[in-house]
């Protein structure tokens, strides 16, 4: 009988799939060292082999797109270091690893240490560009930290002598290979900084295997290069060799000879540049002098043309011509003026105003007499008309009537009273007499009855 809660039941396919997923996701990519056995390479180009140690073994596969990057031919019994993904071949339930990269065991371990140290120093910021110091341009003294018997020193000195023989070089001899090499390299860098004799350092050696170059993958050397106040150029091995020192240094040169070229000036090239510059300066000077000479000649010619004596002579000649022209013009002007005066005198004599003035005076006297007579006659007639008008006006003037004892009475509204019905008792009246006005109040009104005429 089954229990009340049945356990999960896997099919074989599901079991293998679950195990494969667990292996791939939980384990991920790992490094494995071991001995190769049962190595085969079918026509497909893939590699199939077993990786084992003294007590266990595991099947491995390395596909063609991965094994083409391996630089050696794996041999039976060879110790190797592989980077692989763990998986399960589901159809048969075979546990195996898929190899991505392979190295001989010795170099593989070193490469693993290299990658770990590189990641650590990069995380600490030793590779950051902000810490890179610029190289002096030009360098006044070069320090070389390398083996005093190695080919690297010979190459560096040869290039420096060829390019810049006058450049001082200070050698700090040190071992570049072996257990003591990292410590000696560190002390040489510190000594160069203490003495402060150089303004740039070349740290390097010639080519070799990964083990030969391992001193320059040492963390102590990397820290010393980073702490150096003097700019450091790394020159380790060949162009394909890349060490930790290359990442930390202020500049990486592919070879020691290239490092020497970087820190030195090419005196032959400088000499050619100086000669070229000298030729350009000479040509420019010749052109400048020729131009100045031509300009000087022009100015000198102009000065000769503008000499004071020449100018004075020209002005004197011009003055004489002007004097002659002025004298001739003055004589002609006086001659024309005399002729004009004679003509005007003749015209004046012909147009003598005395007879006209006499006739005009006689005419004026006649007109004055006639004007006086006319004015007297008009004045007499006007006086007569004025007298008649005054007499007529006096005859019809109200003042004359008032003078005979009559008066004119007006109401308060200014109207002349003609009948008693125009006023009422109590009203004020104004009366105009010959010599003034009289104001009076109406006390009583008595109209006069008119008698009717009998008609026969």
Curated annotation (Swiss-Prot):
Which Gene Ontology cellular-component terms appear in the entry?
A: cytoplasm; exodeoxyribonuclease VII complex
From the UniProt record, list the coiled-coil ranges.
none
Query: What does it catalyze?
Result: Exonucleolytic cleavage in either 5'- to 3'- or 3'- to 5'-direction to yield nucleoside 5'-phosphates
Kindly give the InterPro entries that the UniProt entry links to this protein: Exonuc_VII_L (IPR003753), Exonuc_VII_lsu_C (IPR020579), OB-fold_nuc-bd_dom (IPR025824)
- Where can this protein be found? Cytoplasm
Task: Extract the Pfam families matched here.
Answer: Exonuc_VII_L (PF02601), tRNA_anti_2 (PF13742)
Lineage top rank: taxon: Bacteria
User: Its biological function?
Assistant: Bidirectionally degrades single-stranded DNA into large acid-insoluble oligonucleotides, which are then degraded further into small acid-soluble oligonucleotides.
Q: How does it assemble?
A: Heterooligomer composed of large and small subunits.
Report what the protein is called: Exodeoxyribonuclease 7 large subunit
Q: Which organism is it from?
A: Shigella dysenteriae serotype 1 (strain Sd197)
